[in-house]
């Protein structure tokens, strides 16, 4: 539900007006956007009159201390109900009948806060590639300004996973136990590793290699979708594991629904051996003109493109394609399978992503991740910083996480004095923090009942607003999916 501003009121912006310059805002329902007058970024750059988006559930109590701050991950939004929905509701981890729950959108994200899609007041056009570097610490400081405007006196618990876990750690380290009472960090790290930095670089290079990138000065309606899609596919492989893909896909063909969709989209089948070979070779390659398979018949200079899904009909286990041989004879060819369910899944995810994200924003946020280091400009020894985090802390790691490894969670728990470490046994890798809802809910509920007892034991209050998604419902910003989509 909406919350009445109590002090230091920030100007609320008209979301409908912002949608005219940022079409992705329509994806987040029920959020608010306020204008923050000024912030000096870590880099020294001063930003003025910039937006911060947030969404709330529940009611702030008179003491202003029943606050849960939820921090979203890399491509998430302020809509916790979408990506952590099964944790949101009465008697769940995020209980709006007892807590005032708020999620603030990080800078660089395309979902309402200051980002490359924001209009630069000095130039009258979007910041685009001239968007200044914003760090995790910059986010925390900007978000603190918004919390102050809402009348928040202290945070009962800050909770986040992956990039959100970085924010949780910074909240605890920056403001101490008097303001941040408790902290939960899932699948994160004290500093961004060389492994993670390298993956971010590979994903950015995918975007840079797209000819439509244009140094970042592309029209929003013509962004480098091929590069952004490839970056997303690359990222997804780091979020899961080899075994999770093998169990889910093996060498199976795409679903019947996906094959039927491909057949509807296919303009015509190849009629020559050359076209047939070309179709297999270029399957998955797209250009603006990729609406059909163009036959080459050995002719130079003829445009040749392929649809991403055209090989579904060629590569199903029962397909027999009639083509003309190079000698002009017609014969039946049954090719070896070259199109698999795993490919269909990646292409589906790439297409889904380019319809909900912006390439410059992706670059900005991955660079934000690269800056994360709790010891940076504080001390030389990272353990020294962790020892200053005196809040009761719950560290949750995933045994199969290859991106933010379980050993990194052990390191956090070892050096944060009042911490407890919990392990999620899941084959899903890093994404388990967005999939293993029941276990995560149980762990957080237990932690809050122990450390926020005055709030969790209080009588529940009636509240209005949306509740979370069922865990089987497809999420816009999370990882819950309908398997028939691919």
From Swiss-Prot:
BP GO terms, sorted: homoserine metabolic process; methionine biosynthetic process; sulfur amino acid metabolic process
Pathway entry: Amino-acid biosynthesis; L-methionine biosynthesis via de novo pathway; O-acetyl-L-homoserine from L-homoserine: step 1/1
Cell location: Cytoplasm
Coiled-coil segments on the chain, per record: none
Domain AB hydrolase-1 span(s) in chain numbering: 66-436
Keyword flag ATP-binding: no
Tree of life domain: Eukaryota
Polar residues composition bias: residue spans: 250-261, 270-280
Record field: catalytic activity: L-homoserine + acetyl-CoA = O-acetyl-L-homoserine + CoA
Keywords from the UniProt entry: Acyltransferase, Amino-acid biosynthesis, Cytoplasm, Methionine biosynthesis, Transferase
GO cellular component entries: cytoplasm
GO MF annotation terms: homoserine O-acetyltransferase activity
Pfam families: Abhydrolase_1 (PF00561)
SUPFAM superfamilies, per database record: alpha/beta-Hydrolases (SSF53474)
Gene3D superfamilies: alpha/beta hydrolase
Additional comment: Present with 2240 molecules/cell in log phase SD medium.
Similarity comment text for this entry: Belongs to the AB hydrolase superfamily. MetX family.
HAMAP family in alphabetical order: MetX_acyltransf (MF_00296)
Described function: Commits homoserine to the methionine biosynthesis pathway by catalyzing its O-acetylation.
Full protein name: Homoserine O-acetyltransferase
Annotated organism of origin: Saccharomyces cerevisiae (strain ATCC 204508 / S288c) (Baker's yeast)
Lineage of producing organism: Eukaryota, Fungi, Dikarya, Ascomycota, Saccharomycotina
Protein's gene: MET2
